[in-house]
Swiss-Prot record:
It comes from Aspergillus hancockii. One of its GO terms (biological process) is L-phenylalanine catabolic process. GO terms for cellular component: cytoplasm. Contains an active site 4-methylidene-imidazol-5-one (MIO), which is formed autocatalytically by cyclization and dehydration of residues Ala-Ser-Gly. It comes from the Eukaryota. This is Phenylalanine ammonia-lyase hkm12. It is an enzyme of class 4 (lyase). Gene3D superfamilies: Fumarase/aspartase (Central domain), Fumarase/aspartase (N-terminal domain), Phenylalanine ammonia-lyase 1, domain 3. Hancockiamide D displays potent cytotoxic activity against murine myeloma NS-1 cells, suggesting a potential antitumour application. More interestingly, hancockiamide C, the likely end metabolite of the hkm pathway, shows potent Arabidopsis thaliana seed anti-germination activity, but is inactive against the monocot Eragrostis tef seed, suggesting that it could be a herbicidal lead targeting monocots. The herbicidal activity of hancockiamide C could be due to its phenylpropanoid-like structural features, which may act on the plant lignan pathways, and hence warrants further investigations. Belongs to the PAL/histidase family. Phenylalanine ammonia-lyase; part of the gene cluster that mediates the biosynthesis of hancockiamides, an unusual new family of N-cinnamoylated piperazines. The NRPS hkm10 and the NmrA-like reductase hkm9 are proposed to convert two molecules of L-Phe to the intermediary piperazine called xenocockiamide A. Xenocockiamide A is then converted to hancockiamide D via a series of hydroxylations and O-methylations. InterPro entries: Aromatic_Lyase, Fumarase/histidase_N, L-Aspartase-like, Phe/His_NH3-lyase_AS, Phe_NH3-lyase, Phe_NH3-lyase_shielding_dom_sf.
Length: 700
């Protein structure tokens, strides 16, 4: 089955998943029929508690029942069927008539994972859990139920409904985190889920929402809740454990978040372009049309959409000083992001197909009444999807790291304060720690990007000489999702601060012209003609603004003095050409000295007043592109992360009631604010805003 979202742009796929998720959440249920399970359905059941139920469609029910009856007919005719009356794997040369015991023997060999007392809640909290998170287990349960509902596995309706009943009653088996090589599927994790539905007292489960509460033996949990135990039929243990459900389920959770992070990387790129007053020209359609890769064209278009109407990003016709073109982290962002979008789309197709596939062995064709021994359990397609996704995340993280560093570094950020401090940099280092954290995140992310598939080891009597390691790859890719989410939170925090400081700077520049104009008039109106005063004033304003951009490492008072001194050559040069000879007796040095002192004082006062007003009320949104405005507003108001005012923000045990708050809000550490953004990203509450910023619904 091909994904219903293909072919399409990446943002269309991301939006479709998000809309499907919220539709499922709104309806409160997901129907399992073996053919239509989506990434969004898996997320809805595992993360949002949607009710999963087996379809009552006649075709689905008949296919399941026919596979069971076909198996029984073949057994009655004396056929030898792999895993039903033979041994398993490299031991398939053995035969037995003890069919029920054989299925129990399979579970015995597979329930070999490590779980400590702490993992089941009867010991001290472990420093590192050996059990899967509950949402992973729930995802596995819904994916496996969907796969065997296709009617190729001889798994009965009763067994499928037993798994779904655990989900419906919010019962989560405790499943070991490690131990599967995703060769004959994810045998070991699935064996613990099967153990739970048969009431194995050696398998543990939790009822309710607490992931760290004490788990009880599955037998006890089922008895307490009045849930009947399942007695497995001739192929049911094999049919339930022999499949790629664990890998496909975790990959679904990974991809849902990876799509969002890829979209967010385009948003943070646009925010960075605006904050650094970069050029929108880098994303002009002509450039993409000259090299028409689908991903590049989409990324460039999306970035431009976010910046539409921006008063900060430079257009193609504007006169620019400094670099004539942006550095690579901005100028080539669409070329960098584009291939990652293409890879994620392919990964999405692979996982969507896997969700709606039969992945056990042997497979039953109820029409021909034939059993086929094959290898659909080899989860290499899932590995392929996860390796691509993890590398894409590394590439996106690297771009965010480069852009973030550029915004923080005063040598690269086009005149923003060093470390993006809002106060004096001699005693405030706002984003320096964030810069260091980003380097730490990036280093770990780069390590995780290494392939897992190249580390395959031979297993199980050389029968499993090649194995996919799909679940291991998915685990590491989920770690990459976590790290890139942290980096994204940092990037959003840094970008919003940089945008605020840029607008604060522009507010201050607006105050400069009257200060310089009045100061020049007061000092030199008896010496220069009005037209000469106007010309010199404009040149001084330009020189002062340029000097302001190059002195961002200095405290405000020293900075104003330095800026004025740097502008003096302009004044002296213009004076020399403008003063007639009969005025040479005038004490120009005194006039210039008075101008220097007065202008410096008024400039500093204007900066302090502008800064004070801005700390109370930010007018940043007036300058932002429409998409950037939506993101900025979400961070500042929906998430509640404010403009960082500097050293005064640091919480202290010595704070009085009056100093423990700023502008009516509490103080937090820098990491405390970033953590709020991180949580909003992970709980999906910002996805709608991100989608709207990149592709407003009205424009679809």
């Amino acid at each position: 089955m091909l994904s219903k979202y293909q072919p399409s742009a990446h943002i269309a796929v991301t939006r479709a998943h998000w809309e499907d998720l919220h539709q499922a959440i709104s309806s409160g249920k997901v129907t399992i029929d073996g053919n239509s399970l989506t990434l969004a359905d898996v997320v809805a059941v595992s993360k949002f508690g949607c009710y999963a139920r087996l379809s009552e469609n006649r075709e689905t029910i008949d296919a399941i029942n026919e596979s069971v009856s076909t198996l029984q007919e073949c057994l009655d005719e004396g056929h030898h069927i792999y895993g039903v009356n033979t041994g398993f794997g490299g031991s398939a040369d053995s035969r037995t008539d003890h069919l029920a015991s054989l299925q129990r023997a399979l579970l015995q060999l597979l329930q070999s994972g490590i779980l400590t007392k702490a993992d089941i809640g009867s010991g001290d909290t472990p420093s590192q859990s050996h059990a899967m998170p509950p949402e992973w287990v729930k995802a596995i349960m819904v994916v496996r139920s969907n796969s065997v509902a296709r009617g190729h596995s001889a798994v009965s309706i009763g067994s499928i409904e037993a798994i779904l009943r655990l989900l419906q009653r919010d019962i989560t088996p405790v499943v070991p985190l490690r131990g599967t090589i995703s060769a004959s599927g994810d045998l070991m994790p699935l064996a613990y889920i099967v153990g739970a539905i048969e009431g194995n007292p050696g398998v543990f489960a939790r009822a309710g929402k607490s992931p760290h509460g004490q788990a009880l033996p599955a037998q006890q949990v089922l008895e307490q809740l009045g849930i009947p135990r399942i007695t497995l039929g001739p192929k049911e243990a094999l049919g339930l454990v022999n499949g790629t459900a664990a890998s496909a389920a975790l990959s679904s959770l990974v991809l849902y978040e990876a799509h969002r992070l890829a979209l967010l990387s385009q948003v943070t790129t646009a925010l960075t372009v605006e904050a650094l007053r970069g050029s929108a020209e880098s994303f002009h359609p002509f450039i993409s049309q000259a090299r028409p890769h689908d991903g590049q064209m989409e990324a460039a278009s999306n970035i431009l959409t976010v910046m539409r109407g921006s008063r900060l990003a430079m257009g193609t016709s504007e006169v620019q000083t400094g670099l004539v073109q942006d550095r690579y982290s901005l100028r080539t962002a669409s070329q960098w992001i584009g291939p990652q979008l293409e890879d994620l789309l392919l990964a999405d197709r692979q996982i969507t197909v896997e969700l709606n596939s039969t992945t056990d062995n042997p497979l039953i064709d109820s029409v021909s009444r034939h059993f086929y021994c094959g290898g659909n359990f080899q989860a290499t397609s899932v590995t392929s999807a996860m390796e691509k996704t993890r590398l894409a995340l590394q590439m996106l993280g690297k771009l965010m790291f480069a852009q973030c560093s550029e915004m923080i570094d005063p040598s690269l950020n086009n005149g923003l304060p060093t470390n993006l401090v809002a106060d004096d940099p001699s005693l405030s280092f706002t984003m320096k720690g964030v810069d260091i954290s980003m380097a730490a995140y990036m280093s770990e992310l780069a390590y995780l990007a290494n392939p897992v598939s190249s580390h395959v080891q031979t297993a199980e009597m050389h029968n499993q000489a090649v194995n996919s390691l799909a679940f291991v790859s998915a685990r590491y890719t989920m770690q990459a999702v976590d790290i890139v989410s942290m980096m994204s939170a940092c990037s959003l925090y840094v970008a919003c601060q940089a945008l605020d400081l840029r607008v604060l700077q522009l507010n201050f520049f607006r105050e400069l012209h009257p200060i310089v104009c009045n100061g020049t008039h007061d000092a030199f109106h008896t010496i220069l003609a009005p037209k000469e005063l106007e010309r010199i004033t404009q040149q001084l304003v330009t020189a002062i603004q340029d000097a302001w951009l190059t002195t961002s490492r200095m405290d405000a008072g020293d900075r104003c003095q330095r800026v004025i001194k740097l502008s003096l050559p302009i004044l002296l040069n213009e004076m020399r050409g403008a003063i007639p000879s009969d005025r040479q007796q005038v004490d120009l040095l005194t006039s210039i000295g008075n101008w220097e002192e007065a202008t410096c004082y008024k400039m500093l006062e204007a900066y302090k007043q502008t800064h004070e007003r801005f700390c109370r009320t930010q007018n940043t949104v007036e300058y932002l592109g429409a998409g950037s405005k939506a993101i900025y507003h979400a961070i500042r108001h929906k998430v509640g992360v404010p403009f960082h005012q500097g050293f005064v923000e640091q919480p202290s045990a010595d704070d009085l009631d009056t100093t423990a708050i700023i502008n009516g809000r509490e103080k937090k550490t820098t990491g405390g604010w970033i953590s709020l953004i991180y949580e909003a990203l992970r709980d999906d509450s910002l996805t709608g805003v991100i989608l709207e910023a990149v592709q407003p619904v009205r424009s679809i």
